[in-house]
């Protein structure tokens, strides 16, 4: 047996598996760009490419934390007022159930719980928005073009 060495030449077009136009998920002014975030550079998954001014987002998070803590206190106060109302109703000597749920503060307790749930949602949104002020590479990639500069508003 003998061996034969074949050589093949061809032309083609290379296409990426994934292509992405990266956009910010929150708005603001670009305060810092990574040195590696340049046209033609290869970036790694999770690498921070740019920072958006986070001042407003830090303030929003602080406010959301305060509102959440206030809602926790308000719910506990309302729960205790309901316990006190039930105790007063039982000590009054009246028979049966109160004519209205308002007497035992049940609607007020539900409203306080709803306020807490809303405050929790606002807090989670504020945390997420603050995290989005760091623009990161979603996967290992080649930067084809960089259409943002320091100071740009996105």
Ranges and model annotations:
Residues 6-10:
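Regulatory alphaC helix of protein kinase catalytic domains
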Residues 24:
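Conserved phosphate/oxyanion-binding catalytic-loop motifs
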């Amino acid at each position: 047996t003998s061996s034969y060495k074949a050589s093949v030449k061809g032309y083609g077009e290379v296409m990426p598996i994934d292509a992405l136009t990266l956009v910010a998920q929150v708005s603001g002014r670009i305060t810092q760009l990574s040195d590696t975030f340049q046209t033609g550079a290869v970036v790694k998954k999770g690498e921070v490419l740019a920072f958006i001014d986070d001042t407003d987002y830090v303030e929003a998070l602080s406010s959301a934390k305060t509102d959440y803590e206030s809602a926790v206190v308000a719910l506990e106060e309302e729960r205790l007022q309901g316990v006190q109302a039930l105790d007063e109703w039982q000590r009054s000597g009246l028979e049966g159930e109160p004519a209205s749920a308002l007497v035992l503060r049940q609607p007020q307790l539900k409203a306080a719980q709803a306020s807490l749930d809303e405050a929790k949602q606002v807090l989670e949104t504020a945390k997420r928005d603050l995290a989005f002020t760091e623009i990161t590479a979603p996967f290992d990639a080649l930067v084809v073009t960089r259409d943002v500069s320091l100071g740009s508003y996105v």
